[in-house]
Regions:
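Intrinsically disordered, low-complexity, repeat-rich regions
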Residues: 1-178
């Protein structure tokens, strides 16, 4: 049985164009974002806030990376948790090449997550989606320890869930520190 949430305020973002000011409260001039791989974003509010957050960070990211692209993963990439082998399709993949370390490519998994998935402690840790965030963080741990891929030319990273109100600053900080 599926559960549906009805937004009585009428401000649900899913299905609305992010580049159309009359349709969205989270407008971005998508046509000017050469790093965003699509013509528009019809995603959830958290997905739109992620695009905005990346835009605001782009100057910092371009100082260390080139060829930066944010891709919406729509069933193209499926990854499997280390603990139980559960399938997971992160909503976004940020790809980049390192300017300072020569021929190093970055692949960063990002999952925007709405507040409806928070647990009773206002975190995602013990929510039904918590295993996904744990897995994303395990990817980063294994990348840093070089147990995921023993090759300095490739970096595979998972970020904590992105939520505009709860974790935006943590995700921003993690991206800056990579």
């Amino acid at each position: 049985m599926r559960k549906y949430t009805v937004n009585v305020s009428g401000n649900a973002e899913f299905g609305r164009s992010q580049k159309n000011k009359s349709e969205t409260e989270i407008f971005e001039n998508i046509d000017q974002l050469d790093w965003y791989a699509y013509d528009d974003n019809f995603g959830t509010s958290e997905e739109k806030y992620l695009v905005r957050a990346i835009r605001e960070l782009m100057n910092d990211l371009q100082e260390k990376w080139s060829d930066i692209y944010l891709l919406r993963n729509d069933k193209a990439v499926k990854i499997y948790s280390f603990d139980e082998g559960r399938a997971f399709e992160p909503d976004f993949i940020l790809l980049a090449n390192d300017k300072k370390v020569g021929n190093t490519s970055w692949q960063i998994f990002i999952e925007p997550k709405g507040s409806q998935f928070l647990d009773s402690n206002n975190t995602f840790k013990n929510s039904k989606e918590g295993w996904k965030e744990k897995f994303l963080l395990q990817i980063t741990e294994r990348d840093e320890a070089r147990t995921l891929l023993d090759d300095e030319r490739y970096r595979i990273v998972g970020l904590p869930f992105f939520n505009n109100e709860m974790s935006r600053e943590v995700v921003n900080s993690n991206l800056k520190d990579l």
